[in-house]
């Protein structure tokens, strides 16, 4: 079941809001990775290339497939057709950012949330300055830092740029990914969410969430949603209030 790249859509919308030109190549659309990347790079001529890594494997203990060689291949292809810096990001990348950046030979990485960090990187790149001092930016040439997951104001993130994706492929048969809060204060030993989103719970206002759901439905015909919060039912009062707000808009 393909999972919509919600984080990437937030990053794309943030860049567009700041006036940057943005194109997305969704590699779920093709088995021919090199021709797809070659065509997009030659047509768009990017000044900056971002690669979003949601998972590092297929999470199947009986038939495991590691995605890292494929990611490295994608980076190599980007370098073949462009001299633009390659920036890695995403949930999968953020778990071990230094090791993965070293393995795939990317230029930079963003550990944790990327919406605001990548916008800042793009602006500084345009000025020809160094980006290694930006919190959250990983570079093998800079000193290693322990605190690498800056937490931003998720409440102010713009509506995801769904128009850059083939939404039908994701939403026609499966629920659409949706997020109304980030962060988790729980201490489950098996979970990486606090590493990626921080331990401070950041909750979006009910009206903002309901408005966004309406936009998804009216503009793209999406009827089913999968809330990807680390814990939708906490706080329980918020979950109940959001449910009532959604029902009231039917």
Residue ranges, per PLM feature:
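Active-site/binding-pocket entry motifs
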Residues: 55, 150-151, 162-164
């Amino acid at each position: 079941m393909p999972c919509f790249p919600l984080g990437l859509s937030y990053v794309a919308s943030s860049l567009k809001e700041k006036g940057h030109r943005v194109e997305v190549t969704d590699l779920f659309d093709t088995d021919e990775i090199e021709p797809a990347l070659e065509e997009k790079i030659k047509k768009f001529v990017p000044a900056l290339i971002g690669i979003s890594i949601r998972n590092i494997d297929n999470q199947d203990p009986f038939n495991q497939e590691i995605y890292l060689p494929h990611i490295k291949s994608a980076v190599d292809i980007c370098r073949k057709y462009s001299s633009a810096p390659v920036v890695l990001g995403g949930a999968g990348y953020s778990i071990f950012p230094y090791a993965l950046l070293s393995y795939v030979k990317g230029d930079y990485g963003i550990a944790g949330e990327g919406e605001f960090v990548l916008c800042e990187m793009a602006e500084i790149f345009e000025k020809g300055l160094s980006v290694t001092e930006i919190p959250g930016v990983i570079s093998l040439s800079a000193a290693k830092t322990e605190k690498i997951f800056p937490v931003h104001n998720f409440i102010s993130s713009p509506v995801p740029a769904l128009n850059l994706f083939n939404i039908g492929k994701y939403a026609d048969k499966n629920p659409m990914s949706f997020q109304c809060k980030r962060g988790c204060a729980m201490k489950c030993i098996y979970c990486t969410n606090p590493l990626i989103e921080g331990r401070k719970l950041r909750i979006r206002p009910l009206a903002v969430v309901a408005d966004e759901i309406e936009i998804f439905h009216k503009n793209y015909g999406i009827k089913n949603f999968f809330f990807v919060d680390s814990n939708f039912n906490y706080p329980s009062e918020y979950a109940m209030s959001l449910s009532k707000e959604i029902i009231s808009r039917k």
